[in-house]
Amino acid sequence: MTTGLPSQTQVIELLGGEFARAGYEIEDVVIDHRARPPRITVVADGDTTLDLDTIAVLSRSASSLLDSLDNIGDSYVLEVSSPGIDRPLTSEKHFRRARGRKVELTLADGSQLTGRIGALQSGSLDLVVRAGREWKVREIPLAEVEKAVVQVEFSPPNPAELELATTGRAAGTEVEA
């Protein structure tokens, strides 16, 4: 049985330009033909936070574009969402977008680090870590990062730690290579 739904590639091609004009890119499209009604899930991300108002605007645009297809067929449910906080950071753009966020890294040698994401440059990541009572920047090659997951924080970060992550410098700290 065919549902008349477009393919993943067709959805990306149809919606990609509209999402790009809004400052977002489509990270994934999942089409579930078994759901009743069938479900099209579009996961988008960008350099600015994907808030509920933006999701509503993107959803309306996506729905209009999808509804304009001749072969869309039966009804469907459209979901537009962000990747979510538990999505592993897998590309340089993910790390860039998460600057200032607390992250847990697993490195190629099996060691784990928890710190705050700082600047990215030339295939490496500045990670702000606690060193005793101070904060220091450790440069971590992205090639050595096996897994990186943003951590949920329920309290505001230490101001010195956050300043170091966002500006790359703070009083009383040093850069460690």
Curated annotation (Swiss-Prot):
Question: InterPro entries recorded for this chain?
Answer: Ribosome_maturation_RimP, RimP_C, RimP_C_sf, RimP_N, RimP_N_sf
GO BP? ribosomal small subunit assembly; translation
Q: Where in the cell is it found?
A: Cytoplasm
Give all cystine bridges in this chain: none
Q: Which domain of life is it from?
A: Bacteria
Q: Where are the transmembrane segments?
A: none
Chief location of this protein within or outside the cell: cytoplasm
Its Gene Ontology cellular component terms are:
cytosol
Q: Which UniProt keywords apply?
A: Cytoplasm, Ribosome biogenesis
What is the similarity comment for this entry?
A: Belongs to the RimP family.
> What is this protein's function?
Required for maturation of 30S ribosomal subunits.
- Read off the PANTHER family from this record: RIBOSOME MATURATION FACTOR RIMP
> What is this protein's name?
Ribosome maturation factor RimP
Q: Which organism is it from?
A: Mycobacterium marinum (strain ATCC BAA-535 / M)
Q: What is the lineage of its organism?
A: Bacteria, Bacillati, Actinomycetota, Actinomycetes, Mycobacteriales
Which gene name does the record give? rimP
